Curated annotation (Swiss-Prot):
Compartments in which it is found: Cytoplasm
Post-translational modifications reported in the UniProt record: Under oxidizing conditions two disulfide bonds are formed involving the reactive cysteines. Under reducing conditions zinc is bound to the reactive cysteines and the protein is inactive.
Protein name: 33 kDa chaperonin
Coiled coil: none
Gene: hslO
Length: 294
């Protein structure tokens, strides 16, 4: 039986290091549903989902985070959207040239990872890092190194569990030096914990209870585990958003679409939901829009 998707935070009591563990298997499967992604693209989406969930958990405010991969290779775009409530969705755009076993470089070509953090209150932040690493894990580590934040490492595991897509991961982050823990002590312990965490296997993360995982990795450490936070697939599409988009189109374009198909069928690329608009629907939307302007 698969584990429920959740984020678990933990703290090493005798050192200035914190951690996160996420399981995103059900969310990952929901993102893949209704799409026909080649296997390498599926893995890419899974890795980025795990990474985004871990990044989202580092936010200390209400807001959204978007992690995008953009490149000039067969895979042009991969996007995961998340928020502080761990509601996630994602999509990829690709050509037919994605070959089995393709590496990140072979799929994305020359590209960038763009991380956009949008608080509900306050200014938006955007960080950009070149896709120089061989894996998403390496690219995220590069992002933290370049942004001069606290020492941080991520550990991403995706694959199959019972024949279905599965994903999970961990994050370690050193906390600022204090009277109790010097910077040198923290750096030394952080390196030790990093080496221990590297040994975690995908199947262990996919199947074992969080307490069991922490015990296996850090049985000589004093670890405090906090209550888990659910993670779930959640799409923000709606009929209202589609209506708002239709209002921005010219009347000629809308009339042309109606003449061609007799209706306008708008499909969400994230979840596959369809929103159908007839000529009568369009007229009502235009009337409403016109009345709101006066």
């Amino acid at each position: 039986m698969s584990k429920k998707d959740a984020l678990s935070r933990f703290l090493f009591e005798k050192s200035a290091v914190r951690g996160e563990l996420v399981t995103v298997t059900e969310t990952y499967q929901s993102i893949l549903e209704n799409h026909h992604y080649p296997e390498p693209v599926q893995h890419l989406l899974g890795d980025l989902l795990v990474a985004t969930s871990l990044l989202t958990a580092t936010l200390k405010f209400d807001g959204d985070i978007t992690v995008q991969l953009q490149g000039d290779g067969p895979v042009r775009l991969v996007v995961i959207n998340g928020n502080n409530e761990q509601q996630m969705r994602g999509v990829a755009r690709f050509s037919d040239d994605v070959k089995a076993g393709s590496s990140l470089k072979e799929m994305m070509g020359n590209g960038f990872m763009v991380i956009t953090i949008t608080p509900k209150k306050g200014e938006r932040y955007q960080g950009i890092v070149a896709l120089d690493g061989e894996t998403i894990e390496a690219c995220i580590d590069n992002y933290f190194n370049q942004s001069e934040q606290l020492p941080t490492r991520v550990f991403i595991r995706t694959g199959l569990q019972d024949g279905k897509a599965a994903g999970a991961g961990m994050l370690l982050q050193a906390l600022p030096a204090s009277a109790e823990h010097s910077a040198d002590e923290t750096a030394e312990h952080f390196e030790l914990l990093t080496q221990l965490t590297h040994t975690i296997k995908a199947q262990e993360l996919f199947t074992l209870d969080t307490k069991e995982i922490l015990h296996r990795l850090y049985h000589e450490e004093d670890v405090t585990l906090y209550d888990p936070q659910p993670i779930a697939f959640h799409c923000t599409c709606s009929r209202k958003r589609c209506e708002d988009t239709l209002v921005t189109l010219s009347k000629e374009d809308v009339a042309h679409l109606l003449q061609e198909q007799g209706k306008i069928d708008m499909e969400c690329e994230y979840c596959g939901a369809h929103y159908i608009f007839t000529e009568e629907d369009i007229n009502n939307i235009n009337k409403l829009s016109s009345s709101n302007l006066h």
